[in-house]
Amino acid sequence: DRTGINNNEIPDFFAKGRMDWYWWREAIQVPTVVDFARQAGLTASTVTWPVMCASGAEYNIGEIWAPQEEDDPTPWFTRANSPAVEEIFEANKHMLRWMKTPQMDEFAAKCAADIIRAHRPDLMLLHLSYVDHQRHRLGVHGDLEHAFRFIDGQMGLVLDALEETGGVENTNIVLLGDHGQLYCDEMFHLNALFHRLGWLQTAEDGSLADYQVYAANCSLSAHIYLRPEVDREMVYCVLLEQQKKYPK
């Protein structure tokens, strides 16, 4: 609640298709590491880093994609990117295949290396998502050797750029993941429960017509949205009862 970001997607439970993502920096309600870096007089770069479109970083390439796969991504990136990276984006945009990875990661790593060579920012945030993608696709126990080797190769491009510019010895490199993952063999559909309780209503085609209580999926968790008139304590008690009933 404090940051304003609790999911990849902006809640729109009545959307007929894919929901928009939180792409734009303005959605974040607290200062970011980029803000603190710039306040300290440092230059910053964000490359396909989540929720950093129009981030204010001097060398920013947003994480964004066009609504449809066949659409030209240029107008979207033009809005999201900083003017200083226009040539770098134009030189590398042919690598993009909509939102698909590993192509997005190949594009991002190449742009990051080019930014380092051209501008040498003090801070760079780079998001590579292929391991995440493969983990979601193959499961916790899937073979990720290929994905790890791929990411290793992309990081090699970035390190090569640092070595060429003489910055590798004076650079702190931090690798991190944005979430963990647990094995799951059962699913619980909270909205089916809410429907039985009369807390949400569906149309004839099964789509959502209205709700008083709604569960928005977020992988192994869910966010429960309530209309203002709904008794929060009552909903909480029902959920606790279900947790006791289904402890797994």
Identify the residue ranges that each predicted region occupies.
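His/Asp/Glu-rich, glycine-adjacent segments
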Residues: 1-139, 244
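Secreted, luminal/periplasmic, and some membrane-associated catalytic domains
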Residues: 7-22, 157-248
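Stable alpha-helical elements in mature extracytoplasmic
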Residues: 29-33, 108, 147, 151-154, ...
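Beta-strand elements within well-structured catalytic alpha/beta cores of enzymes
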Residues: 37, 112, 122-129, 144-162, ...
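Short secondary-structure boundary/capping segments
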Residues: 61-63, 139-144, 188-194
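Glycine-rich loops and low-complexity Gly/Arg-rich segments
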Residues: 69-73, 149-153, 198-202
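Residue-level preference for long, well-ordered alpha-helices that form the structural scaffold
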Residues: 97, 101-105, 140-151, 231, ...
